Amino acid sequence: MKKSDVLIIGSGISGLFAACVAADAGKKVQILSYGAGTLTIGGGIIDVLGYTDRGKPVEDPLQAIDKASPKHPYAKVGSQTVKKALETFLSITASEGFPYIGSPAKNQWLPTAIGNFKPTCLVPRTMDTRALLDAENILVVG
């Protein structure tokens, strides 16, 4: 049996990102997965911190991480680590021809399947929400 430096379980967006980062660091990576992962059913959006503990929408996820409870998972790793991870993700996806738009420091509003909007950090370029801000009416067909 061949040995690996890193074993990743799951081939969703998080698993594939972890595999890319480890491989770029020179590690021999093996991915264990059953089926196609969540990429077949998910939109590929990257949420970071959309709402505060009190349910208020977050405009700047990095700033909100700095203000979060020390027990919050993002606070434990710190905003700069989250920022670096998101910048690495943006770099990898752009270099692979699947660019994302957005900023680690500013959430954008994305329409949901039930007709409302939710804050999210990064979205594939094919899901650019800027045109929605200028629209007077939005028609959803489905």
For the regions a language model picked out, list residue spans one by one.
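C-terminal catalytic lobe of FAD-dependent flavoproteins
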Residues: 142
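Extreme N-terminal leader/targeting segments of oxidoreductases
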Residues: 1-6, 24-25, 37, 53-55, ...
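Hydrophobic, helix-prone linear segments
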Residues: 1-3, 11-16, 84-91
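N-terminal Rossmann-like FAD-binding beta1-loop-alpha1 element of flavoenzymes
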Residues: 4-31
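Charged, low-complexity surface patches
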Residues: 11, 71, 78
